[in-house]
């Protein structure tokens, strides 16, 4: 039964680890769109080549075919990513020096194991490099904390690190290899720290982090803001107190009346004013042709 579990876990670890190696493809595509590496760090690729080469030599020395298959694919992928990163890096001097240093270290290790093979010494070195490899994405942690966003931290690689390290930690327990258990246990912890950054920090600037979005959803604050943007929520203003009309005195009313009469009299012609108001009305005497109204009696 244990052999079946080990075989299934070996296939699963090989599959997920190779999938981890392909997580560098989105990073390379982002570099190509930008035309330069920008703030993206090439340390994960360098550590992938370095750690993969040491683990490959460890697997060959131990004759562990699971580790041999995984690390052959891993070294090939990471070497391709390093060449791609070198093409787009400006200036190239820094990354070139780092690449030469990594290559020299691998060459020294191969020569040392060929002259004096020691599985324990090599296991300790592999364990150290593996821990550094899991923490390699933290090299860009300074940029993440400075910008307060995690766009430069590769999420697929962090997730894959967590899955792979947990499987290899279980694999190390089954094969009783302390050099596999310790680094992958630490790798699980580092992966959890990296994933926690994606929860507390936003992906891009001027955006909310997933934790803030969850808090807004629980409190309902986000829905209130959307209602205000749509104009659904109308805030009623308190009723305004009626304006008080100032009290007018009797003299003010008389002044307004005199002014109104003066304006009215100015619009009437002088002849009309004189005929209508100055002289009494004239009456015409009755002529003989006019009818005598006195003869008309009332009924």
Curated annotation (Swiss-Prot):
Q: Where are the transmembrane segments?
A: 8-28, 36-56, 67-87, 95-115, 124-144, 155-175, 180-200
Composition-biased stretches (Basic and acidic residues): 247-261
Map out region (Disordered) in residue numbers. 230-299
Localisation per UniProt entry: Golgi apparatus membrane; Cell membrane
Main location (coarse class): Golgi
Q: How does it sit in the membrane?
A: Multi-pass membrane protein
Q: What segments bear the compositional bias annotation Low complexity?
A: 276-299
Where is each MtN3/slv domain found? 7-91, 121-205
- Any one of the GO BP annotations: carbohydrate transport
Q: Which UniProt keywords apply?
A: Cell membrane, Golgi apparatus, Membrane, Repeat, Sugar transport, Transmembrane, Transmembrane helix, Transport
Q: Name one GO molecular function term.
A: sugar transmembrane transporter activity
State the GO CC annotations. Answer: Golgi apparatus; Golgi membrane; membrane; plasma membrane
Which Gene3D superfamilies does this UniProt record tie to the protein? 1.20.1280.290
What InterPro entries does the annotation carry? SWEET, SWEET_rpt
Q: What exactly does this protein do?
A: Mediates both low-affinity uptake and efflux of sugar across the membrane.
Per the record, the similarity remark reads: Belongs to the SWEET sugar transporter family.
* Protein name, as recorded: Sugar transporter SWEET1
Species the sequence originates in: Caenorhabditis elegans
* Biological classification of the source: Eukaryota, Metazoa, Ecdysozoa, Nematoda, Chromadorea
Question: Which gene codes for it?
Answer: swt-1
């Amino acid at each position: 039964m244990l052999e079946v579990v080990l075989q299934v876990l070996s296939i699963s670890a090989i599959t997920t680890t190779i999938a981890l190696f392909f997580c560098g493809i989105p990073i390379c595509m982002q570099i190509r769109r930008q035309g330069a590496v920008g703030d993206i760090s090439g340390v994960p690729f360098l550590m992938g080549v370095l750690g993969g080469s040491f683990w490959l030599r460890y697997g060959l020395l131990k004759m562990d075919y699971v580790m041999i298959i995984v690390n052959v694919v891993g070294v090939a992928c990471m070497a391709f990513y390093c060449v791609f990163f070198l093409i787009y890096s400006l200036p190239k001097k820094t990354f070139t020096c780092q690449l030469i240093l990594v290559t020299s270290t691998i060459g020294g290790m191969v020569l040392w194991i060929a002259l004096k093979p020691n599985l324990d010494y090599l296991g300790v070195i592999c364990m150290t490099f593996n821990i550094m490899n899991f923490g390699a994405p933290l090299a860009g942690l300074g940029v993440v904390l400075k910008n307060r966003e995690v766009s430069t931290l590769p999420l697929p690689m962090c997730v894959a690190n967590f899955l792979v390290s947990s499987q290899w930690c279980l694999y190390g327990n089954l094969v009783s290899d302390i050099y596999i258990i310790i680094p992958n246990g630490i790798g699980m912890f580092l992966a959890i720290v990296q994933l926690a950054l994606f929860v507390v920090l936003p992906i891009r600037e001027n955006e909310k982090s997933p934790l803030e979005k969850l808090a807004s959803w629980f409190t309902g604050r986000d829905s209130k803001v959307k209602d205000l943007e749509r104009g659904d929520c109308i805030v009623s203003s308190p009723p305004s107190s009626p304006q008080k009309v100032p009290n007018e005195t009797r003299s003010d009313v008389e002044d307004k009346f005199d002014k109104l009469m003066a304006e009215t009299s100015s619009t009437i012609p002088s002849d009309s004013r004189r005929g209508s108001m100055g002289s009494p009305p004239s009456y015409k005497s009755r002529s003989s042709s006019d009818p005598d109204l006195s003869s008309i009696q009332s009924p």
